[in-house]
C-alpha cells in the first residue's frame, strides 16, 4: 500500500483477489434473491456483485481517492483451467450428435464476425479514422474478448502503427463484456415470454440440477451419509493440470505463426486427451469432479474479471469509438433476434441466443454465465451448452484470428 499524487494505491494479491471474488459472487446471489426484478430477468450473480464492486472502485479511482490493483495471475490460471475443461468436453462422439445444428451455428456466427468488422471499419472510415480502429472495435474485441484484444492490440500497434491500439481494443472489449452480461440473460427471458417458448421445466418439471452426468460412481466415506468426490476431484485436477502444462508448450509454439488467445493450446491438448480416452476406452475424463472444476473456475474467473473492470475508462472514450460500440450493440441485438428465428424459435434457440450474445460481445465464460442463469430458472439445454462451448471457446477463435489477420492486411 502506498500513495501517488495524493491517491492511495492498494495492491491486492492473487489469493486476496480470489477471496474478494468469492465474497462478491455470494453477495450477488444474495442480492438476486432479495430483488424480485433481478430474479425475474435472470441477471447473473457475478454481474450483480461484480458490477457494484467495479462501480465503487472505478469511482474511487476516477476521483483520485484510491486505486486498487488486482494481481490477475490466479485469474489467468482459472481461465486456463475453465477452458481446459471445455476442451475436455470436446468429444467427437458428442460433436457428431450436434450435427447440422453445430455446423449451422458456426456458419451463422462466422457471418456475425464478418459483419462486426465491416460495421466497425465502415463507421471508422466515415468518421475519418484508420479502419484498423474499426477492426479493433469489431470482432477483435467483440468476438474475441479481452484475451484476443490483449493479443491483437500490440500486434496492430507494431504492424500497422495504430497508436493506442491495445487501449482501444481492451476498452471496447470491456464495454462489450459489460453489455453482454447485462443484456444476454434478460434478452433470453424476453424471448421466452414474448414467444411463449416451451421450456424443459414445463415439459417434464425436473429437479434443479448441475450439468453433471448421472451415470457416474461416487466414493462414499465409511460412516458418512453424504458422498464425497475427492477421488474424482483429484483425478480431474490431475488431467486438467497436465493438459494446461502441455498446452502452454503448444501455445508458445503456435504463437510463432499465428496470434491466438493463451488458452487455445490447452484446449487443443485437452480435446486430444478426451478423444484418445473416448476411442481407446482406457480412461474417462468426464464426471462430477470435472464438472466441479469447470463451475468453480467459471464463477471465480468471471467474477474476478468483472471486479477488475475499469468502468471509468468508458467515460474517456472518444465519440467515434462510442458510436462504433453503440452500432455493435444494436447489431448484436438484431442479429440475436434473427438467430432465434433461424434456429426454430425453440428453447435451444433461446439458449443459443443467450450464449451467443455473451461470447460475441465478451467471452465464452460470459455466454455460459448467461445460459446458466436461464438454466437455473427454466432448465438446461445440454446441446446448446455444448455448441456454445465448442463454437464460442474454440472454433470461432480460430476463425476470428485468421479473419482479423487477413482483414488487417487490407
Question: What would you call each of these model-derived segments?
Answer:
Residues 24, 51-59, 72-99, 268-277, ...:
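Hydrophobic transmembrane alpha-helices of secondary-active transporters
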Residues 1-18, 189-237, 278-283:
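Intrinsically disordered, low-complexity non-transmembrane regions of multi-pass membrane transporters
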Residues 123-168, 175, 187, 205-207, ...:
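Alpha-helical membrane segments and immediately flanking helix-loop junctions
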Residues 26-39, 85-97, 187, 272-287, ...:
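C-terminal ends of transmembrane helices
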Residues 122-129, 173-217, 338-347, 392-410:
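Juxtamembrane and boundary regions of transmembrane helices in multi-pass small-molecule transporters
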Residues 31-47, 64, 68, 194, ...:
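Flexible hinge motifs at transmembrane-helix junctions and intramembrane kinks/re-entrant loops
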Residues 77, 92-121, 237-240, 292, ...:
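Entry/N-cap segments of selected transmembrane alpha helices
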Residues 9-23, 69-83, 132-139, 257-269, ...:
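Structural signature of hydrophobic alpha-helical transmembrane segments
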Amino acid at each position: 500500500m502506498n500513495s501517488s499524487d495524493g491517491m492511495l494505491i492498494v495492491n491486492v494479491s492473487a489469493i486476496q483477489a480470489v477471496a474478494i471474488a468469492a465474497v462478491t459472487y455470494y453477495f450477488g446471489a444474495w442480492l438476486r434473491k432479495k430483488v424480485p426484478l433481478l430474479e425475474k430477468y435472470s441477471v447473473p450473480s457475478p454481474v450483480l456483485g461484480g458490477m457494484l464492486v467495479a462501480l465503487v472502485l472505478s469511482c474511487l479511482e476516477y476521483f483520485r481517492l484510491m486505486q486498487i490493483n488486482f494481481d490477475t495471475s490466479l485469474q489467468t490460471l482459472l481461465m486456463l483451467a475453465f477452458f481446459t475443461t471445455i476442451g475436455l468436453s470436446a468429444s467427437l462422439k458428442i460433436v457428431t450428435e450436434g450435427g447440422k445444428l453445430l455446423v449451422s451455428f458456426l456458419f451463422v456466427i462466422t457471418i456475425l464476425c464478418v459483419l462486426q468488422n465491416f460495421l466497425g471499419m465502415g463507421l471508422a472510415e466515415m468518421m475519418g479514422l484508420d479502419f484498423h480502429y474499426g477492426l479493433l472495435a469489431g470482432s477483435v474485441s467483440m468476438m474475441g474478448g479481452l484475451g484476443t484484444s490483449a493479443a491483437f492490440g500490440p500486434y496492430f500497434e507494431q504492424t500497422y502503427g495504430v497508436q493506442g491500439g491495445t487501449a482501444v481494443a481492451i476498452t471496447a472489449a470491456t464495454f462489450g463484456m459489460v453489455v453482454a452480461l447485462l443484456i444476454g440473460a434478460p434478452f433470453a427471458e424476453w424471448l421466452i415470454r414474448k414467444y411463449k417458448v416451451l421450456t424443459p421445466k414445463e415439459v417434464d418439471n425436473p429437479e434443479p440440477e448441475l450439468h453433471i452426468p448421472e451415470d457416474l460412481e461416487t466414493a462414499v466415506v465409511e460412516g458418512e451419509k453424504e458422498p464425497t468426490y475427492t477421488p474424482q476431484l483429484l483425478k480431474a485436477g490431475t488431467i486438467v493440470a497436465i493438459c494446461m502444462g502441455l498446452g502452454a508448450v503448444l501455445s508458445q509454439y503456435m504463437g510463432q505463426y499465428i496470434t491466438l488467445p493463451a488458452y487455445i493450446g490447452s484446449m487443443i491438448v485437452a480435446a486430444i486427451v478426451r478423444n484418445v480416452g473416448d476411442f481407446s476406452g482406457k480412461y474417462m475424463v468426464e464426471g462430477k469432479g470435472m464438472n466441479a472444476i469447470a463451475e468453480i473456475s467459471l464463477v471465480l474467473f468471471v467474477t474476478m474479471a468483472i471486479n477488475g473492470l475499469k468502468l471509468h475508462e468508458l467515460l474517456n472514450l472518444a465519440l467515434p469509438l462510442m458510436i462504433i460500440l453503440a452500432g455493435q450493440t444494436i447489431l448484436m441485438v438484431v442479429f440475436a433476434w434473427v438467430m432465434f428465428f433461424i434456429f426454430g424459435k425453440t428453447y435451444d434457440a433461446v439458449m443459443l441466443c443467450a450464449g451467443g450474445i455473451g461470447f460475441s460481445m465478451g467471452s465464452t465464460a460470459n455466454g455460459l454465465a448467461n445460459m446458466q442463469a436461464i438454466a437455473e430458472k427454466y432448465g438446461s439445454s445440454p446441446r446448446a451448452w455444448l455448441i456454445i462451448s465448442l463454437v464460442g471457446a474454440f472454433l470461432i477463435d480460430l476463425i476470428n484470428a485468421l479473419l482479423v489477420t487477413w482483414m488487417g492486411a487490407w
